[in-house]
């Protein structure tokens, strides 16, 4: 089964926030993405609300509930109390926990599962009691012991950080080496009973190789590259192009 595509709305929100105006519309373009066959919408609401605002969350939840009940809402963030309260209020289908400092421009590394094992175990337990699927942001390094610790937290999935892979857009040999490593990491995780998502700097050009090395990839979450393409091709056609890159017929 092809990997599902979740469209990250943060870049759209960041463009909107350049002016005190309601456009481009986060929910409007989210609707277009879902109409074009995206499987879900992703947001990462940071404490300073520099892109997604807390006030965006309920309209996105309502859009999915009212118009696209088969789609999923994925909320990403560092698991402090403020983020967890947002999650519990807006009830996404999936919660992706990332080890971000609030000042970071973007997510750029996975969890240290040895150092953060107790924190993650407590947070995952809290979220699982509420019925959320939980994914943990993970580096693409085939470390069986670390992935075993991730599994022990009770998480359902990992999301492989693909930034280094995406950064090899002009070095195909290095991209191949990293894709092999990501594939090995995914294989270990799947063997432990974790499903595997992926995200960061994924494009129409580099998705096919990633999917080749991770044939059981469950989901990709894509924002920057997809939004950049949408400026050229339009949101609907861009979503279809990314779906085809994931192996779907679109």
UniProtKB/Swiss-Prot annotation:
Gene3D superfamilies: Aldolase class I. Its main location: cytoplasm. It holds the Pfam family PdxJ. It is an enzyme of class 2 (transferase). One of its GO terms (cellular component) is cytosol. Its EC number is 2.6.99.2. InterPro entries: Aldolase_TIM, PyrdxlP_synth_PdxJ, Pyridoxine-5'_phos_synth. It is found in: Cytoplasm. The record marks 159 as: Transition state stabilizer. Belongs to the PNP synthase family. Catalyzes the complicated ring closure reaction between the two acyclic compounds 1-deoxy-D-xylulose-5-phosphate (DXP) and 3-amino-2-oxopropyl phosphate (1-amino-acetone-3-phosphate or AAP) to form pyridoxine 5'-phosphate (PNP) and inorganic phosphate. This is Pyridoxine 5'-phosphate synthase. It comes from Rhizobium meliloti (strain 1021). The gene is pdxJ.
């Amino acid at each position: 089964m092809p990997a599902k595509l979740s469209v990250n709305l943060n870049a759209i929100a960041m463009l909107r926030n350049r002016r005190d105006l309601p456009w481009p519309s986060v929910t409007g373009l989210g609707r277009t993405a879902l109409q074009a066959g995206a499987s879900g919408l992703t947001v990462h609401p940071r404490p300073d609300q520099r892109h997604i605002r807390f006030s965006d969350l309920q309209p996105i939840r309502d859009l999915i509930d009212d118009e696209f009940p088969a789609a999923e809402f994925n909320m990403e963030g560092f698991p402090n109390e403020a983020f967890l309260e947002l999650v519990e209020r807006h009830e996404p289908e999936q919660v992706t926990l990332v080890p971000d400092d609030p000042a970071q421009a973007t997510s750029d590394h996975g969890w240290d599962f040895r150092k953060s094992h107790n924190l993650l175990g407590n947070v995952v337990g809290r979220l699982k009691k509420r019925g959320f699927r939980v994914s943990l942001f993970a580096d693409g390094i085939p470390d069986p012991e670390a992935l075993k610790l991730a599994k022990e937290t009770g998480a359902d999935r990992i999301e492989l950080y693909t930034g280094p892979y995406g950064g090899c857009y002009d070095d195909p040999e290095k991209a191949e080496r990293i894709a092999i490593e990501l594939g090995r990491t995914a294989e270990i995780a799947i063997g432990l009973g974790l499903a595997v998502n992926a995200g960061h700097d994924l494009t129409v050009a580099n998705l096919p190789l990633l999917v080749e090395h991770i044939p059981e990839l469950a989901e990709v979450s894509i924002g920057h590259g997809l939004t950049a393409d949408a400026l050229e091709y339009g949101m609907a056609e861009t979503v279809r192009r990314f779906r085809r890159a994931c192996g779907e017929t679109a």
